[in-house]
């Protein structure tokens, strides 16, 4: 998951040279949604054939409640439509390393919101870590990327996407105690893909698809299957088993992979300020982890409704 998401920044950045960001992502999301819906249907058929003897990753027998349906709807809008809208729009307007480093503050955001919701008790080290991470982000988008310059708008859009992803991760945590990660991820993806495609429709029609190279088509398909389908599913399998706070820690390595790939492939410069900012973001996340003390145990596999 870490390697896929880290490399995906450069993949989509390169693809944007041939396909505008929103049409690219609309097609990517539609493809991922179709794959998810087909897989969910196959899992349901398999469950009936085996009388429900399947891994809770793919199927759980609990019926959807009215609250579940409402949650799936708004999580689809926030976690897929809005998140992808801001994330892709931001990456298109900033550097790969800037975007990845800002996303790297997600664990701190998730821990902070968890504390505000009463799910975690936050110690002084967490707040120190949050301050250190914010300082690192400032170095990246403030000094490292010429604050007020060409990348500022993109940096701010990526920051908004962090808010959307934090909301999505924490908001879906209770759903995957009753329903499989496959179902929750797939249904929210399908729900979010619809308004995204409608919003991007004028650009989709205006795009010269005949001029798109085979490389970019391959990148689009692989990004849909790996960065959206596989990685999203892995993310929520982890959330189901170890909880959102611990799962978010694995995203700490995404900026490192993204910066390395961008430096090698896209030849983005690794400035001292950017490297310092990266170090501060990671150090802040580490301090945040040390300062967290869970007030309630996070659900393990035996608590996940399987």
Language-model features: locations:
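Glycine-/small-residue-enriched transmembrane alpha-helix faces in small-molecule transporters
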Residues: 1-26, 32, 147-174, 182, ...
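C-terminal transmembrane-helix exit sites in multi-pass transporters
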Residues: 35-41, 63, 106-131, 256-276
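Specific transmembrane alpha-helical segments of multi-pass solute transporters/efflux pumps
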Residues: 3-4, 8-9, 41-49, 54-103, ...
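Intrinsic disorder in cytosolic terminal tails and internal cytosolic loops
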Residues: 48-61, 292-306
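Helix-helix packing/entry segments at the starts of transmembrane helices
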Residues: 25-27, 84, 98-105, 171-194, ...
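Hydrophobic/small/kink-forming positions within alpha-helical transmembrane segments
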Residues: 3-6, 37, 76-81, 85, ...
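Hydrophobic transmembrane alpha-helices of multi-pass small-molecule transport proteins
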Residues: 36, 122-143, 190, 196, ...
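Juxtamembrane helix-entry segments on the extracytoplasmic side of multipass membrane proteins
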Residues: 18-26, 64-69, 127, 142-167, ...
């Amino acid at each position: 998951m870490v390697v896929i998401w880290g490399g995906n920044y450069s993949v989509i950045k390169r693809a944007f040279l041939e396909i505008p960001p929103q049409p690219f992502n609309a097609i990517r999301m539609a493809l991922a949604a179709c794959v998810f819906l087909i897989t969910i249907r196959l899992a349901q058929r398999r469950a009936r054939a085996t009388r429900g003897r399947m891994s809770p990753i793919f199927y759980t027998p609990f019926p959807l409640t009215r609250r579940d349906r409402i949650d799936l709807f708004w999580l689809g809008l926030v976690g897929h439509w809005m998140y992808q809208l801001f994330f892709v729009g931001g990456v298109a307007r900033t550097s790969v390393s800037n975007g990845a480093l800002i996303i790297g503050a997600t664990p701190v955001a998730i821990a902070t919101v968890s504390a505000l919701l009463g799910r975690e008790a936050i110690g002084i080290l967490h707040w120190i870590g949050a301050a250190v991470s914010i300082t690192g982000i400032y170095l990246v988008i403030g000094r490292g990327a010429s604050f007020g310059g060409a990348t500022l708008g993109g940096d701010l859009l990526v920051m908004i996407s962090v808010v959307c992803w934090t909301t999505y991760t924490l908001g879906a945590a209770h759903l995957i105690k009753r329903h499989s990660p496959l179902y929750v991820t797939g249904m929210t993806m399908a729900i979010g893909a619809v308004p995204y495609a409608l919003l991007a429709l004028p650009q989709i029609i205006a795009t010269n698809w005949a001029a798109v190279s085979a490389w970019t088509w391959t990148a689009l398909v692989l990004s849909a299957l790996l960065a959206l389908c596989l990685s999203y599913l892995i993310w929520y399998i982890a959330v189901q088993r170890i909880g959102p706070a611990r799962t978010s820690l694995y995203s700490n390595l995404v900026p490192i992979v993204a910066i390395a790939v961008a430096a090698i492939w896209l030849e983005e410069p690794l400035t001292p300020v950017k490297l310092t900012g990266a170090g501060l973001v990671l150090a802040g996340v580490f301090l945040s982890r040390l300062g967290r003390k869970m007030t309630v145990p996070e659900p393990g596999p035996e608590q996940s409704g399987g």
